[in-house]
Regions:
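Hydrophobic/aromatic-rich core segments of domains that either
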Residues: 26-30, 42-44, 171-193, 198-208, ...
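A short, amphipathic beta-strand motif
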Residues: 315-326, 406-408
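Short, acidic Ser/Thr/Gly-rich low-complexity loop/linker segments typical of extracellular
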Residues: 339-353, 448, 565-569
């Protein structure tokens, strides 16, 4: 029924010539209509507050509370812990995020439930903050409606949260508004006071009744900050990237709506590629209207996401010409995330043309449409360059190539610190356990950057003892030795200081496991042996190529992902022959790991996207 409300309201919203949006919302209220009319009557002599009430009621369809015995049981657990109000309110929102708990809850539409007294109280409290807070003196009425007035931020249970501001925070805000000229006229500066208070409510990391709780996690921290900001009279919103275009996952954060500064906070997307940035709003935004039994992806059945990509990125519009089945009314752009194609934007068909607006640059997009619930490829994927030019990636089966691949996921600079720590280490060999007159084998002079380092060794000499020696405590994934026939040799591990940890992991042929070496580590082979090759690998993400792992290469055409065959790696790179050129590729590891990214080939090398 809730989805019905969303589509019905959006459809009616687009037909304002027949009836006003307010009248349509009141029709949906059913038996609750007198309560909402009572609010309008209450403000009949206050035009501004009446406009605010109309805004809330007009956009109320589609907003709802999730409730049920499961959530009430969860609340009893939280109530027994003596958690501060604001933290408790956000903790109670976490089960609403997960399908396994959501399916146990029932939606209660606001339009049928919200009472006059509650709505009047919320409106009066919001206006009190707007008219008495010096930092809001230049806040526009439209921004007030969207970013301060709303009585909810998600699907939480409704209460009188504006009345529950922490007394210490309230006193800090009053002090600043009375005395601190550099703060009291700036929403952003006042928000720093609230931010510090919200951060002080650190719950740590925990798991309550199977629900993960972490104040460091972006969704939790955004909800916590947004409630704290609006409670204190700071206009704010949550912006989010539903899925990254160059890595797995998503992100969301809180933005301050400041009358002087741009309403974005830096440091959220600059180091990543975002196809779209959306803002959670109370008011409804355009969404695809299905015709007959047309399938609409779930993200775009929610009208409360506003496209704000232009606030963050230099964007481009993209027009695609392609024929689709006559019953198809909408097409979509998808990106590769989490080993699947995920929808990020939509367009309505107009004479076999689809126009997508404000798209993020330097991204590979996959145009798709739906037949029933089945996703189909509209045309070939393309690269949207920063200059707005699109480059179609149509596989060329007449020009084939040989690919030598070394990774399945891009190497990020912030993950190679374990390799940096290795610089300065030395490897030595000796037949004396004290390493008197030891033979110098290798110096670590550069960061291996998660790649294995293969060190050839003089096979005419034999040594019983091998030593890793360093001034630092480091973490290694592998330390391997091979004889002149390429066979692995194993010895006894000696930890001179006795402060190492998980040292057996260095010799388990698992690149994802690792051990901590405290300055020195010795391997005793029991007798002098001939070593032809020594290999070491810093702690890493296991996204390289590793001997014994099975890999499969795919390329993308109009029929989807096409396999180019499976291979077992025999070294730290893998070769695939007779590969179509000018395609999007995907290398999968069927043995281990989850992180995988698509790539193209530029100048003979992998370019990850």
């Amino acid at each position: 029924r809730l989805i019905f409300y969303l589509f019905l309201f959006t459809l009616l919203h687009s037909c304002r010539e027949a009836n006003s949006q307010l009248e349509q919302a009141l029709k949906l209220a059913g038996d609750n209509k007198p309560e909402l009319q009572k609010v309008l009557k209450h403000y009949s002599d206050d035009s501004l507050k009446r406009e605010a009430a109309i805004f809330l009621i007009e956009n109320m369809p589609g907003h709802y509370t999730l409730d049920g015995p499961y959530l009430r049981q969860f609340q009893r657990v939280i109530d027994s812990m003596g958690t501060p109000y604001l933290m408790k309110k956000v903790i109670l929102m976490q089960p609403l995020r997960y399908p396994r708990s959501r399916q146990q809850l029932r939606a209660k539409p606001d339009i049928e439930q919200v009472k006059a007294d509650y709505l009047i109280h919320q409106i009066d409290q919001a206006f009190r903050l707007w008219t008495t807070s010096p930092w809001l003196e230049n806040l526009t009425f439209d921004d007030f409606l969207e970013y301060l007035l709303p009585y909810r931020i998600g699907n939480e249970s409704l209460d009188y949260w504006r009345d529950s501001i922490d007394l210490r925070l309230k006193n800090r805000l009053q002090e600043a508004s009375l005395y601190f000229d550099n703060q009291k006229h700036s929403p952003y500066n006042m928000a720093q006071i609230v931010y510090g208070h919200a951060l002080g409510l650190d719950y740590g990391n925990d798991n309550l009744v199977g629900i993960p709780i972490s104040t460091k996690e972006c969704v939790f921290s955004s909800q916590l900050q947004l409630l704290a900001y609006r409670m204190a009279g700071i206009p704010a919103a949550i912006d989010h990237v539903p899925c990254w275009a160059d890595m797995n996952g998503f992100h969301e954060w809180t933005v301050i709506i400041d009358t002087k500064n741009k309403d974005i906070l830096s440091g959220q997307i600059e180091m990543k590629n975002a196809p779209k940035v959306y803002r959670r709003t109370y008011s409804a935004n355009p969404i695809p209207i299905p015709e007959e039994d047309e399938y609409i992806p779930p993200f775009f059945t929610d009208p409360f996401n506003r496209d704000v990509t232009d606030k963050y990125l230099h964007t481009s519009d993209v027009t695609i010409t392609a024929s689709v089945p006559v019953q198809t009314r909408h097409a979509y752009l998808a990106i590769f995330n989490g080993r699947e194609l995920r929808i990020v934007d939509w367009s309505k068909v107009q004479q076999d043309k689809f126009c997508f607006h404000s798209m993020g640059p330097d991204i590979i997009y996959f145009p798709v449409y739906f037949e029933k619930e089945y996703q189909r490829n509209l045309t070939y994927p393309f690269i949207l360059q920063a200059n707005g030019i699109t480059v179609k990636l149509r596989p060329d089966t007449t020009r084939r190539q040989t690919l030598i691949l070394t990774r399945k996921y891009p190497l990020h600079h912030n993950k190679v610190y374990h390799g940096n720590a290795l610089i300065g280490a030395i490897f030595q060999a000796s037949n004396d356990p004290t390493f008197r007159n030891a033979t110098h084998i290798h110096d670590v002079t550069r960061n291996p950057n998660m790649y294995p380092v293969i060190v050839p060794v003089d096979t005419t000499k034999k040594y019983r003892y091998w030593r890793f020696n360093h001034s630092k405590i480091v973490e290694l994934a592998e330390w391997k030795f091979k004889d002149n026939r390429g066979r692995d040799l194993t010895g006894t591990i000696i930890d001179p200081e006795g402060k190492g940890a998980r040292l057996a992991n260095l010799f388990d042929n698992d690149p994802l496991s690792h051990g901590r070496v405290s300055h020195q580590l010795i391997v005793d082979f029991g007798h002098p042996v001939c070593i032809s090759e020594m290999i070491y690998l810093p702690r890493n993400d296991a996204n390289g190529i590793y001997p014994g792992n099975e890999y499969e290469l795919f390329y993308f055409d109009l029929n989807g992902w096409q396999s180019l065959g499976c291979k077992i790696a025999t070294g730290y790179s893998i070769e695939f022959e007779n590969i179509p050129s000018n395609a999007v590729y995907w290398l999968r590891n069927h043995t281990a790991g989850k992180e995988e990214r698509i790539f193209t080939i530029q100048n003979g090398k992998q370019r990850f996207w």
